[in-house]
């Protein structure tokens, strides 16, 4: 499964936002 850089960045941003929400 090959994702381009923009897709990876979008996924990372989404995951970190969810993680921040879960930790706060």
Swiss-Prot record:
<keyword id="KW-0694">RNA-binding</keyword>
<keyword id="KW-0699">rRNA-binding</keyword>
<comment type="function">
    <text>Forms part of the ribosomal stalk, playing a central role in the interaction of the ribosome with GTP-bound translation factors.</text>
</comment>
<dbReference type="GO" id="GO:1990904">
    <property type="term" value="C:ribonucleoprotein complex"/>
</dbReference>
<dbReference type="GO" id="GO:0019843">
    <property type="term" value="F:rRNA binding"/>
</dbReference>
<protein>
    <recommendedName>
        <fullName>Large ribosomal subunit protein uL10</fullName>
    </recommendedName>
</protein>
<keyword id="KW-0687">Ribonucleoprotein</keyword>
<comment type="similarity">
    <text>Belongs to the universal ribosomal protein uL10 family.</text>
</comment>
<dbReference type="GO" id="GO:0005840">
    <property type="term" value="C:ribosome"/>
</dbReference>
<comment type="subunit">
    <text>Part of the ribosomal stalk of the 50S ribosomal subunit. The N-terminus interacts with L11 and the large rRNA to form the base of the stalk. The C-terminus forms an elongated spine to which L12 dimers bind in a sequential fashion forming a multimeric L10(L12)X complex.</text>
</comment>
<keyword id="KW-0689">Ribosomal protein</keyword>
């Amino acid at each position: 499964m090959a994702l381009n850089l923009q897709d990876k960045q979008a996924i990372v941003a989404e995951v970190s936002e969810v993680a921040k929400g879960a930790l706060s």
